[in-house]
Swiss-Prot record:
Keywords: Chromatin regulator, Nucleus, Repeat, Repressor, Transcription, Transcription regulation, WD repeat. One of its GO terms (biological process) is chromatin remodeling. It comes from Emericella nidulans (strain FGSC A4 / ATCC 38163 / CBS 112.46 / NRRL 194 / M139). CDD domains: WD40. Gene3D superfamilies: YVTN repeat-like/Quinoprotein amine dehydrogenase. This is Protein hir1. SMART domains: WD40.
Length: 1031
């Protein structure tokens, strides 16, 4: 196979800034004459040192050329082609050097990505048999073949630190590979059509992909460690933004959509965009991911864009033009080259609204790829007619290239540079760094004071730039901050006077008790005073020096009510569940055949036959002894009281085939829901006495008819009357033809659930908001919170509706997974499942379920599954389980000392996890499981191999709390649990977990601390700078 290399010199004169620009274009035609046809050249790239040009073509070869020989084409003795590799079985569409220069990657239509590396040994083989090519000069060998695509690989991209390689293809997949081990880290299937381009952020925080679904998608990522696996990167590579506006009517005929990121990290040049009816290149701004700049001029779709890797200055750079801060006085500009289906090349600079170079008809077919040399002086292009072009610019044609340090300086504002040195990207990150440094300095002073014997050294934290004493910590558990009061000036338990400062430390009662025990005096026979020794730690290897699990042996008066001292973001069940919870019954698939006649039926038939011997039709009544003939009774006299319950509800036929059945409430004559002036549910006046009437604002009442039908037919019974009262004055009234079982409501709406499974919703003014919502069975639980309504049917289906948007956050979800239906599915008989002791909904529409076995669940609308937030295992195995003491059991809300406009944000999901854990403690103690579980834990601790059992379970418990609080958006709980978890893993020396906590799915420390700080309220954009770091 012969290669014909014929250089041809072209000169293009373009006027820019009142002077002439001369661009020398060397055109080299690569004709592959093996089959008397020229193969398309699809891709090219330049090595980081600028010495090699690599090309990929339709002949299945990856060819490496010497850039020195190309630019110095007048010297025919220099070898132009250094090596050629043929490891693909089809057309090669893309080829890219890694930024560290160590690897070369290629992708082809055989769905394979090949990785090459340069071997220092000379090549051991000559040119291919039957070819006229010169023997190879360099030895490039294939080290890996990456299999992960289902169709052609269209483009490749390396991160700036070479830590990852990303491949895109016609299978709509974006596959991320490790740049160290070349293992597949993640597959992103977010595009709906062919993906034809990828580019990386020079700040190493994002990468962008372009697809035929007419979108450019931005992904945020953190550079993985060299030993990272796919499991480690599950939360990495997150979709940040989807850009659609510039591509809404873009043509789908383009072979590539190769975009490029500017070297200063500010812009993305997206190919194949449109501006009205004409093709253009869209310039997308970083951060906002929008832009109103379009490069217009090409007559056909632009398929490839390439920013020059250097920043340029319009004027020559001199040392005396730099200011004292070592920044160039003149604003730098960037240069971008564009090409596509019109076979023309345009070069633009940011300081000029028009292109400075336009070269037309450079090839017979479309230009497929562009690549700049590292110094920005030469531009290479490939075309589908087999052409490889080299465009060389003289000094000053594009401007004057700045030093690479200017690139690094321009990237520091994004929080990092290519070397990964993280700095604060935003003012929030800077404030956190200052706070962290002040805290570290205070901690060092405290430790030095302790070493030097200074008893006044304390571990104060710094808030708002001022030292603020925090309460002492015990065993990694951070107590709630005490409110300043006069109690702080009273004497301490050991008799010493407290400091006179306005804010003092609240002593730990356990530490004070331990000090008193240590100082307990004893007297010998001769009257001498001695201090009795106290064993504060044992030598047993199975015992932990950390706090033991404190689980109460019995429920005492210290156990508080279900409502903690802080606001619990849950609905209040006043039309509540029965004592002991709502009974549930699970049916297995294996049912015994129903007998036509059993022994009991026989006895009944005998009694019926005996009663009908005289020819009368017997009337039977149900008695404890069974079915007995009815006995006449005296007629009632006087006024009869209205019964509380009229009858049991009629069971829906669908329950006969359901494997889950919940107890259906009885039909009551009078159902009431009352709220106070603040819109919170309260007890109605009839049951709470006169003292509560002043607090009741509105009462919603449903009255079911208790008397007989006026016509004698059951179908003609009286309708149900629903009335809304304010005081004694009715506001509105409505009637329903169906018996009402449950009612609920608040200031946003009122709702009633009927016996036939229908749910009605009214506005506060009495207007029916929607038509009747028909469920598959009777509702057994009906709750509301804000605009949300929760309805649970008798077959265990949970429905959540938003009355403001008339929508549901997720499809109906079954309670079977929560009630361990899988355990009982194969049972031959019905079995009792755990009872539902609490079913609530929070202000975000999340379902919260508490069971009689102590487990607590929340439904995740994003994962479409139940999440177990609390269980008895943590109560006896975790060292951080504490049911009655702050800060875990009775979490104090910090929002009462903050501004009122923060209350709503702070109350989201507040107190849910402590509420579920208190339920776990109570149910565990009531059912006597605590004693047996504690014995099991003690037995495990004494066995070999379980030395770290208690520590592992405690850390897992904190991780479960942390994940639950983050999922629920509970700010106060997340603040506490994150502090406890960070202290514990730091004390245990778990370096891997510490690194994951700090790096996680973000690029550096600021990317994980700033979102957490905003969630916790540490950083508040609305407050002043002095108050921005308030804890």
């Amino acid at each position: 196979m012969d290669i014909l290399y014929r250089p041809m010199l072209l000169s293009i004169y373009v006027c820019r800034a009142s002077r002439t620009v001369l661009a020398n274009i060397f055109v080299s035609f690569s004709g592959f004459l093996g089959e008397r046809k020229a193969f398309e050249v699809y891709s090219c790239d330049v090595s980081p040192d600028g010495s090699r040009l690599v090309t990929a073509a339709g002949d299945g070869y990856v060819r490496i050329w010497s850039t020195e020989a190309i630019c110095g084409a007048e010297d025919a003795n220099k070898p132009k082609q250094l090596a050629s590799m043929s490891n693909h079985s089809g057309t090669i569409h893309t080829v890219r050097f890694s930024p560290n220069g160590k690897y070369l990657a290629s992708g082809a239509d055989d769905k394979i990505v090949c990785i090459y590396t340069l071997d220092a040994n000379p090549p051991s083989h000559a040119a291919s048999f039957g070819s006229n090519e010169a023997p190879p000069v360099e030895n490039w060998r294939t080290i890996r073949r990456l299999i992960g695509h289902d169709n052609d690989v269209q483009d490749l991209g390396w991160s700036c630190d070479s830590s990852i390689l990303v491949s895109v293809g016609l299978d709509s997949k974006v596959v991320v590979w490790s740049g160290h081990t070349f293992e597949k880290l993640k597959t992103l299937s977010v595009h709906q059509s062919h993906v034809k381009g990828i580019t990386f952020d020079p700040a190493n925080k994002y990468f962008a992909t372009a697809s035929d679904d007419r979108t450019v998608r931005i992904f945020r990522f953190t550079s993985p460690a060299p030993n990272s696996t796919a499991h480690d990167q599950m939360n990495n590579f997150v979709l940040e933004q989807t850009i659609t506006a510039p591509f809404q009517n873009s043509p789908l005929t383009a072979y590539f959509r190769r975009c490029s990121w500017s070297p200063d990290g500010l812009h993305i040049a997206a190919a194949n965009a449109v501006n009205g009816p004409v093709s253009s290149v869209a310039i997308i701004n970083r951060g906002g991911w929008d832009g109103d700049i379009n490069l217009i001029g090409h007559e056909a779709p632009v398929e490839v864009c390439a920013f020059s890797p250097r920043l340029y200055s319009p004027q020559p750079i001199k040392k005396n033009q730099q200011d004292s801060h070592d920044h160039v006085a003149q604003a730098p500009v960037t240069v971008i080259a564009c090409a596509g289906g019109d076979k023309s090349l345009s070069v633009w600079i940011t300081s000029n609204p028009r292109p400075i170079v336009v070269a037309q008809e450079l090839a017979a077919k479309s230009i497929s790829d562009l690549a700049w040399s590292p110094d920005g002086s030469c531009l290479y292009a490939t075309a589908l007619d087999g052409t490889i072009l080299a465009v060389r610019f003289e000094d000053g044609d594009l401007g004057y290239a700045m030093e690479l340090e200017e690139n690094e300086k321009s990237l520091t504002k994004f929080g990092t540079n290519r070397k990964g040195a993280g700095i604060a990207e935003t003012t929030d990150g800077l404030l956190l760094e200052e706070k962290s440094k002040a805290g570290e300095l205070k901690g060092v002073e405290g430790r030095m004071g302790a070493l030097m014997g200074d008893g006044h050294a304390t571990g104060d934290a710094v808030a708002n730039g001022k030292p603020t004493p925090l309460p002492s910590t015990s065993n990694g558990v951070t107590p709630a901050a005490p409110s300043p009061s006069t109690d702080a000036q009273k004497s301490q338990p050991n008799g010493t006077a407290a400091p006179s400062a306005s804010e003092t430390e609240k002593p730990d009662p356990y530490q004070a008790k331990l000090e008193r025990l240590k100082q307990r005096p004893t007297y010998t026979k001769d009257g001498k005073k001695r201090i009795a020794p106290l064993l504060v730690s044992g030598a047993g290897g199975a015992e932990s020096s950390l706090p033991q699990a404190r689980l109460m042996a019995s429920v005492s008066s210290q156990v508080k009510a279900d409502t903690p001292q802080s606001i619990v973001d849950l609905s209040k069940p006043f039309d509540g569940l029965p004592k002991g919870g709502l009974a549930t019954l699970l049916f297995g698939n294996k049912r015994k055949l129903a007998q036509l006649e059993d022994e009991e039926d026989g006895h009944t038939e005998k009694r019926v036959a005996l009663a009908s011997q005289n020819g009368a039709t017997p009337i039977l009544t149900s008695a404890p002894e069974g079915l007995l003939p009815a006995q006449p009774q005296d007629p009632p006299t006087g006024q009869q009281p209205t019964p509380e319950f009229i009858r049991p509800a009629v069971v829906n036929p669908c329950m006969s085939v359901s494997q889950l059945r919940l107890a259906v409430p009885k039909v009551r004559t009078h159902i009431v829901r009352a709220i106070d002036s603040a819109g919170k549910p309260t007890e109605p006046p009839s049951t709470s006495g006169e003292s509560n009437k002043s607090r009741v604002d509105v009462v919603f009442e449903a009255r079911n008819p208790s008397g007989a039908s006026l016509t004698g037919r059951a179908a003609d019974r009286e309708p149900v009357r629903l009335t809304l009262f304010r005081g004694e004055q009715p506001l509105w009234q409505d009637f329903l033809p169906r018996t009402v079982l449950l009612v609920t409501g608040n200031q946003n709406m009122w709702s009633a659930a009927c016996e036939d499974g229908s749910v009605y919703i009214w506005t506060p003014a009495g207007r029916r908001l929607v038509s009747a919502l028909v469920l598959e069975a009777q509702p057994v639980i009906l709750e509301c919170n804000g605009p949300w309504i929760l309805s649970i049917s008798a077959v265990g289906m949970c429905y959540v509706w938003n009355v403001e948007h008339l929508s549901s956050p997720h499809p109906p979800v079954s309670l079977q997974p929560v009630l361990d239906a899988a355990i009982h599915t194969l049972g031959a008989h019905p079995s009792a499942a755990p009872s539902i002791t609490n079913a609530r909904i929070n202000s975000e529409g999340r379902i919260i379920i508490a069971l009689s076995n102590g487990e607590g669940y929340a439904y995740s609308p994003s994962l479409y599954t139940w999440q177990r937030l609390s269980e008895a295992w943590w109560a006896v195995g975790s060292q951080y389980w504490n049911s009655t003491e702050a800060p875990v059991g009775n979490l104090q809300s910090a929002s009462n000392t903050q501004q009122k406009d923060k209350d709503a944000r702070a109350a989201v999901s507040a107190g849910i996890i402590p509420f579920l854990e208190r339920n776990t403690t109570n149910e565990t103690l009531l059912r006597g499981r605590a004693y047996f579980l504690q014995r099991l834990i003690k037995t495990l601790l004494s066995r070999e191999g379980y030395e770290s059992f208690e520590s592992s379970v405690s850390i897992a418990h904190l991780e479960n709390r942390l994940a639950g609080a983050l999922s629920l958006g509970a700010k106060e709980e997340f603040r506490l649990y994150l502090s406890m978890y960070a202290k514990r893993i730091g004390a245990e020396g778990l370096r891997g977990k510490v690194e994951e906590l700090l790096k996680g799915k973000h690029r550096d420390l600021q990317r994980v601390t700033v979102p957490y700080a905003k969630l916790l309220g540490v950083v508040d954009n609305e407050s002043d700078a002095n108050d921005a770091m308030e804890l």
